[in-house]
Amino acid sequence: MKRFPTSAIAAIAAAALFGMASNASAQAAAPAGCSDDVPQRATRGNTEFVSNSQTVRGLLYKPTGPANGAAVVLLHSSEGLSVDAHSFDPHAIQLAARGYHVLVPNYFEARARQVPWNGRDVRLWAEAGHAAVAYMGTLEGVDPARVGIWGFSLGGFVATDGSAHPDSTARVAVGVGTGQDIFEASRGRRELPMMLIEGYSTFPIISAATMRELAANLRRRGATVEVQMLASPERSMTGQVWCEVFQHTRRFLDANLLPAAAPEAPAG
């Protein structure tokens, strides 16, 4: 499968979102970069779904080998998909190569970004996340009861706080570099597994303390929250940090979205 340089990925993503990606570029694999990468047996294409009468476009990754029946939605940060696409892409490819269906939506198409954002903005973004999860559950090869949602920074807050709402059908939620400094937590209550990931490399405003405040809030609202601190000493979101983030992400998704392995029969 043809490989594109990392610098080309953001351009490919932007082209796909505007309907200009050719079949060849949509299926081009991202460069490998982590020590545990598997062969890139996955495709990338463009798709769209509707949230509150707004069309939301995104990138859809599918396994070319056997699907595992699970799916995950990846939500970008406040910088937008055009900035985060090059960081997400190789890891979305790796998830798909392992059997997951993966959607990376441009959820700002459901509600344009403004600074500062307000409660209505956050609510509409959360509802776009709900719609993305529901959309993934309609795809062939996906069990609608095994769809998770993941987000980075603002996207992490939208994914976790939004999934605590009764309207969400996400089976699990993961937030990376997020906390209550993003926005005031909502009041919805829902029981589901969540994981919050924090490290030295996340934005200064998102400290471990504010992440733990969000974890405590989500627990009070019914979630079972795992807190994972990154081991990497890197002070920026380097490739090494992203590898560690997605290693923890895959472990959590596998544990909560995939069937437990059958115990081996006793010898003899």
What residues fall within each predicted segment?
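Alpha/beta-hydrolase fold nucleophile elbow
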Residues: 142-152
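The feature captures the conserved acid-bearing segment of alpha/beta-hydrolase catalytic domains
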Residues: 172-226
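C-terminal catalytic histidine-bearing segment of alpha/beta-hydrolase fold enzymes
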Residues: 221-268
